[in-house]
């Protein structure tokens, strides 16, 4: 959800008067609320794997009263293009994906060598396809994702979790979205934590409840003095709290996790 923010920022920069609404799963709302370019977060009530054409038709029809001028369809799946089609949105832009001719009427055919980065692919959709042939054609600098978090929120949330203001924070995200094969070993995290704590930092471990045990393994490898400067918050934060605390960190060390 964060990478597409570059598209929203680019659209806002090109069309300052445009009203940008985003349809996404309800859990994304805390992230979207930190994107000032986004006017409204519309919850997608259907699950990731569900086709449910009838429900998508009903959802699309419910959006017709908003009279959107353009839709940008970011997932590559066939079903993701159904709602804007049923909503009768005149211009429907996206990468071809699952052969979505007809559902999309501004179809881009992906050349992975020409567009190596996902963020570049999203930003390219904000421009006419005849102009943007490769990533080299994109205006620089790119508008990178940058969630808005205030200093007051950082201070308040750090106090909520009794994190010290005496030492700068380094965040670890030791879990992985797709299993242990993509995990940096916990003992490497532990060695890095020891080094950072001895250099004057505090270490904060982030993740879901399923990552809590991994965090405890990292903690267990530290001596008593070092443990005083390492907090395992995996499974203890809401998404919005995690976003704020990560923004308060000097750096993040992460696997290919959801928080990444």
Regions found by a protein language model. Name each.
Residues 1-260:
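Catalytic machinery of carbohydrate-active enzymes
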């Amino acid at each position: 959800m964060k990478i597409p923010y570059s598209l929203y920022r680019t659209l806002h920069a090109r069309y300052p008067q445009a009203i940008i609404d985003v349809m996404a799963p309800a859990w994304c709302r805390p992230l979207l609320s930190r994107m000032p370019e986004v006017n409204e977060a519309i919850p997608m009530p259907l699950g990731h794997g569900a086709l449910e054409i009838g429900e998508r038709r009903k959802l699309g029809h419910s959006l017709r009263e908003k009279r959107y001028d353009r839709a940008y369809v970011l997932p590559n799946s066939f079903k993701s293009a159904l709602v804007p089609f049923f909503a009768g949105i005149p211009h429907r832009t996206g990468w071809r994906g699952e052969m979505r001719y007809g559902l999309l009427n501004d179809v881009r055919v992906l050349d992975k060598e020409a567009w190596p980065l996902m963020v570049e692919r999203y930003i390219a959709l904000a421009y006419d396809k005849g102009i943007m042939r490769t990533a080299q054609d994109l205006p620089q600098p790119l508008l990178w994702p940058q969630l808005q978090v205030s200093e007051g929120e950082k201070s308040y949330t750090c106090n909520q979790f009794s994190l010290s203001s005496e030492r700068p924070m380094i965040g670890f995200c030791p879990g992985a979205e797709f299993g242990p094969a993509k995990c940096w070993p916990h003992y490497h995290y532990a060695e890095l934590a020891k080094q950072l704590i001895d250099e004057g930092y505090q270490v904060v471990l982030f993740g879901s409840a399923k990552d809590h045990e991994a965090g405890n393994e990292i903690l267990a490898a530290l001596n008593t003095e070092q443990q005083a400067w390492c907090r395992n918050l995996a499974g203890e934060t809401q998404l919005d709290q995690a976003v704020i605390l990560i923004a308060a960190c000097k750096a993040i060390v992460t696997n290919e996790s959801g928080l990444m």
